[in-house]
């Protein structure tokens, strides 16, 4: 079983992760991310936007099992995070989340 919080932290430290709904949507338009993570309590309009852009870009989506507050805590940030995009996983194995989902 993959520890999502640990792998997310490794990806942030060793790779490139874009944080925030607006920035994630921008990155999806360029097709840069390899994975998008969205909080389970994200509003329907936000989830639909992300799913639409991710489908166009061919990027998999992983729904974080916790709230946006918990996703922020997992990323070691002092604020809520509704969505984030993993552009470069670095040394983490975060892309394996898609295989297990």
Swiss-Prot record:
Organism of provenance: Pyrobaculum calidifontis (strain DSM 21063 / JCM 11548 / VA1)
Signal peptide limits: none
Domain of life: Archaea
Keywords: Ribonucleoprotein, Ribosomal protein
Name of the featured protein: Large ribosomal subunit protein eL30
GO biological process: translation
PROSITE patterns: RIBOSOMAL_L30E_2
NCBIfam families the record matches: PRK01018.1
KW Coiled coil (keyword) present: no
A GO molecular-function descriptor: structural constituent of ribosome
UniProt similarity note: Belongs to the eukaryotic ribosomal protein eL30 family.
Gene name tied to this protein: rpl30e
Pfam families from the UniProt entry: Ribosomal_L7Ae
Secreted in keyword set: no
Annotated Gene Ontology cellular component terms: cytosolic large ribosomal subunit
């Amino acid at each position: 079983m993959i520890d999502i919080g640990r792998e997310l932290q490794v990806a942030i430290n060793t790779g490139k992760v874009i944080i925030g709904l607006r920035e994630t949507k921008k990155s999806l338009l360029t097709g840069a991310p390899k994975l998008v993570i969205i909080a389970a309590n994200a509003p329907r309009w936000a989830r639909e936007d992300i799913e639409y852009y991710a489908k166009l870009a061919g990027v998999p989506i992983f729904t974080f099992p916790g709230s946006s507050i918990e996703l922020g805590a997992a990323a070691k940030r002092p604020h809520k995070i509704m969505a984030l995009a993993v552009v470069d996983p670095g040394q983490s194995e975060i892309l394996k989340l898609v295989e297990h989902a």
